[in-house]
């Protein structure tokens, strides 16, 4: 499917600095220091997309500009202080606001905006903003119901925002429908389709929770789903950890949209904006979340913000822009997280305690009076953590070992 955003031109929030971000239809990862304006920027991108695509304001621009010229002429020919003059003045002010809503920052270059607008009208095209503070609100199911959902709910601002809350209800409906397809209707094809959907959902749970023992268990007496996992008490969608709740606030909404429309998730397109995509996530999940969403909903273009080097290095199909540096970085998927931490953020991947030990070893290596015993004591403090040392730390560790050998063998520096 076509990805629609080609370029974003804007001023950095709270500054006069103009920036141009080239997306070329790729995902966008925004990074930068706290207070650099990432959240303000993604908020403004979302509002602009709503204005120019969902509200069709881009289509109206030429008409507004023509109307403005008309009212400027009316004002010119009217006597100041007259009702005609006041009417013209008010119309010009109104049209200025409408024109400004399209032409003001950010300026978003869209590849085939009419096609994007058509897809949004059909509800296959999404324009979603998931704020930094997000938790899933998946509701309990009380009974089984049909799966012919009202597509009109997607157009309604209130009900459309809550479709993700119906995930457990949808699962109950699918289990019930599968049972009827076997016992009442003898519909083998339907039974296989539902079984595959549920199996795929189970596989997604295993992937996200990094545990092959994870599976859904349905309590048919209470219309309740439990997530079972070896070594843990069964738990529900209502008491997910904050990290998984953050993920499901995104996943359940997009998944339920495809179910409302009775299409594969791969048929959805548009733009999903996720502020602080790494919020509350363990580092292993930070590596997985953007690739997972990109593979689950491949037609959607993602714009995300993050501080995490694990997110920055997790995908190759993304442009990365550092707002603090006003710099487009490009693909970082081939870089280690240590090099990203130090190169992009200027932060060492080693802890303060480790850095102190390394500095001490470096001094001893340079000191001609250092004894093998002193170096061996320092090396022993590091070797238990050798597997997790960064490149610089491993270099000094090996240099210390080399110095010990030279001293013992009587070799000069």
Where are these regions (language model features)?
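Switch/communication elements of ASCE P-loop NTPase nucleotide-binding domains
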Residues: 1-55, 224-350
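Extended helical coiled-coil dimerization/tether regions that scaffold
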Residues: 2, 9, 100, 104, ...
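Secondary-structure edge/capping motif, primarily at the C-terminal ends of alpha-helices
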Residues: 75, 261, 365-369
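Soluble or luminal CAZymes and related metallo-dependent hydrolases
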Residues: 193-197, 246, 285, 353, ...
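RecA-like P-loop NTPase motor core
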Residues: 291, 295, 310-413
């Amino acid at each position: 499917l076509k990805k629609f955003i080609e370029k974003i031109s804007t001023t950095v929030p709270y500054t006069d600095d103009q920036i141009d971000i080239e997306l070329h239809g790729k995902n966008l990862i925004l990074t930068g220091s706290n207070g650099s304006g990432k959240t303000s920027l993604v908020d403004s991108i979302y509002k602009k997309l709503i204005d120019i695509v969902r509200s069709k304001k881009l289509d109206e621009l030429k008409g507004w500009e023509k109307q403005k010229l008309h009212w400027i002429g009316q004002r010119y020919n009217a006597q100041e202080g007259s009702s005609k003059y006041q009417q013209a003045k008010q119309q010009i002010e109104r049209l200025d606001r409408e024109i400004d809503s399209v032409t003001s920052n950010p300026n978003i270059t869209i590849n085939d905006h009419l096609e994007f607008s058509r897809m949004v009208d059909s509800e296959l095209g999404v324009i979603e903003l998931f704020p930094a503070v997000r938790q899933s609100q998946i509701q309990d199911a009380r009974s089984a119901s049909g799966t012919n959902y009202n597509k009109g709910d997607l157009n309604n601002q209130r009900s459309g925002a809550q479709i993700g809350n119906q995930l457990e209800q949808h699962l109950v409906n699918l289990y019930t429908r599968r049972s009827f397809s076997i016992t009442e209707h003898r519909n083998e094809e339907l039974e296989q389709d539902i079984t595959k959907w549920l199996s795929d959902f189970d596989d997604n749970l295993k992937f996200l929770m990094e545990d092959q023992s994870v599976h859904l268990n349905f309590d048919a007496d209470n219309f309740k789903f439990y997530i079972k996992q070896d070594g843990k008490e069964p738990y529900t969608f209502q008491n997910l950890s904050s990290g998984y709740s953050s993920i499901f606030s995104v996943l359940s909404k997009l998944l339920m949209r495809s179910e409302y429309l009775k299409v594969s998730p791969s048929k959805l397109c548009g733009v999903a904006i996720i502020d602080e995509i790494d919020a509350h996530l363990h580092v292993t999940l930070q590596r997985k979340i953007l690739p997972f969403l990109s593979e689950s909903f491949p037609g959607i273009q993602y714009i995300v913000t993050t501080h995490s080097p694990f997110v920055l290095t997790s995908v190759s199909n993304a442009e990365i822009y550092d707002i603090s540096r006003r710099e487009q970085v490009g693909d970082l998927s081939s870089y280690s997280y240590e090099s990203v931490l130090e190169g992009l953020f200027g932060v060492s991947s080693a802890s303060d305690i480790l850095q102190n030990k390394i500095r001490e070893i470096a001094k001893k290596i340079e000191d001609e009076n250092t004894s093998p015993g002193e170096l061996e004591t320092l090396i022993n403090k590091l070797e238990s953590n050798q597997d997790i040392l960064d490149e610089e730390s491993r270099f000094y560790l090996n240099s210390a070992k080399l110095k010990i050998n030279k001293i013992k063998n009587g070799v000069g520096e």
